[in-house]
Each structure stands twice: as structure tokens, then as C-alpha cells.
Curated annotation (Swiss-Prot):
Consists of three domains, a large central CORE domain and two small peripheral domains, NMPbind and LID, which undergo movements during catalysis. The LID domain closes over the site of phosphoryl transfer upon ATP binding. Assembling and dissambling the active center during each catalytic cycle provides an effective means to prevent ATP hydrolysis. Residues 30-59 are annotated as: NMP. The lineage of its organism: Bacteria, Pseudomonadati, Pseudomonadota, Gammaproteobacteria, Alteromonadales. CDD domains: ADK (cd01428). It comes from Shewanella amazonensis (strain ATCC BAA-1098 / SB2B). Pathway: Purine metabolism; AMP biosynthesis via salvage pathway; AMP from ADP: step 1/1. This is Adenylate kinase.
Length: 214
């Protein structure tokens, strides 16, 4: 089963991706994770990507397509995969089709912008462990401190409100057209397309996705 997850940054795609991956036994291919790994490793591409992401911009198609093509050629993708955060644009979707990468089901998780701003700008991260908190939904025991080590929590540059709003603007401009694109592909019978209300509970959204995929 080859699945694409669509939705704005902060819509909860990562959480649902985890559910789908475990439930169906297919790997999640998150361009964000691939990019963060490159940034952490300090590779030339990683450093270039960090500069772009910190400014709230999107990295080049060339870099992302190279990473994705390499990844889905691996053995664990033989039974399918879940793409999270790719394609972002119609040219990327066209490039996938041109490379013979067919998709069985496209899932969109829809959340209003203001809800996303509240979700993302409230995130706090412990740099040493990667533990993530939220000032409203999952606060640390002591404000601004990691529960385990007591060390300071930080706001990732891409969780700053101004950066979140900039990324949402880019999403609406570049990625929203994919909704129409895959709607047409589905109408032609070449994939299935389902939209979900992402403001519902995580468990409810998971249940609805499972029903749509079965």
C-alpha cells in the first residue's frame, strides 16, 4: 500500500503516520526526518537545508527527490510506504508520476491555520534528548525545564510563530493545489482520496483513517 499524507505543517501528520506505519507494517518516509538527519550529521546538504529551514523556506525539489527516490528503492518499501511531507508541489507530483511511482491512497488532514499556530508555537524541545513538550497540551512539570534532566527547554527556530505563519503561507500557495491535483487523479480512478477533520482527537482521526484504508 503506497500512501501520501497531505496537510499543513502542524496538522498532526506525523502522529497519524506513526499509526499507519505500525498498523500496516510499512515504513514512513518523512522528508523532515531525512532532512533533520542530514542537518544533525552536518553534511554540506544538511547545512544548506538548515539555513533554508531556519528562514522558514522550503528546500529544493532536487534535494528532496534525490532523497525520496533513494529511500523507496530500499527493500523495506517492497510492500508499500507512507510519504509524509512529499510531494509538496504539483511539479513534484508530476516528477513522481514520471518516475513510475504510483500511489494507492491520498489522505488529507485538514486543520485551520490559527489552530496550527497555537499547536506549533507552544512546542518546547529538550535539545539533548529530543523530548518534546507543549505549554498547553503537554507541559513540563517545571515551566521551561526538562522533566528528566531539569535542563532548559528551547523553541526550535521552525516553531517560532513568525516562521510557522510563513510556512503556512507557503503551504497554501504551493501545496493546497495538490488537493485538486489528486482529486482529479482519484476521479480518473488512478488513486483514492480522502479528507479528514484534524481538529478531532488523535484516536478518532486514526479510527477514520483505518476505516478509509480497509
Amino acid at each position: 500500500m503506497r500512501i501520501i499524507l497531505l496537510g499543513a505543517p502542524g496538522a498532526g501528520k506525523g502522529t497519524q503516520a506513526q499509526f499507519i506505519m505500525e498498523h500496516y507494517g510499512i515504513p514512513q518516509i518523512s522528508t523532515g526526518d531525512m532532512l533533520r538527519a542530514a542537518v544533525k550529521a552536518g553534511t554540506p546538504l544538511g547545512l544548506e537545508a538548515k539555513k533554508v529551514m531556519d528562514a522558514g523556506q522550503l528546500v529544493s525539489d532536487e534535494l528532496i527527490i534525490g532523497l525520496v527516490k533513494e529511500r523507496i528503492a530500499q527493500d523495506d518499501c517492497a510492500n508499500g510506504f507512507l510519504l509524509d511531507g512529499f510531494p509538496r508541489t504539483i511539479p513534484q507530483a508530476d516528477a513522481m508520476a514520471a518516475n513510475g511511482i504510483s500511489i494507492d491512497h491520498v489522505i488529507e488532514i485538514d486543520v485551520p491555520d490559527e489552530e496550527i499556530v497555537n499547536r506549533m508555537s507552544g512546542r518546547r524541545v529538550h535539545p539533548g534528548s529530543g523530548r518534546v513538550y507543549h505549554v498547553v497540551f503537554n507541559p513540563p512539570k517545571v515551566e521551561g525545564k526538562d522533566d528528566v534532566t531539569g535542563e532548559d527547554l528551547v523553541i526550535r527556530p521552525d516553531d517560532e510563530e513568525s516562521t510557522v505563519r510563513k510556512r503556512l503561507g507557503i503551504y497554501h500557495e504551493q501545496t493546497k493545489p495538490l488537493v485538486d491535483y489528486y482529486g482529479k487523479v482519484a476521479a480518473e480512478g488512478n488513486t483514492k482520496y480522502t479528507k479528514f477533520d484534524g481538529t478531532q482527537s488523535v484516536a478518532e482521526v486514526s479510527k477514520l483513517i483505518q476505516a478509509a484504508l480497509s
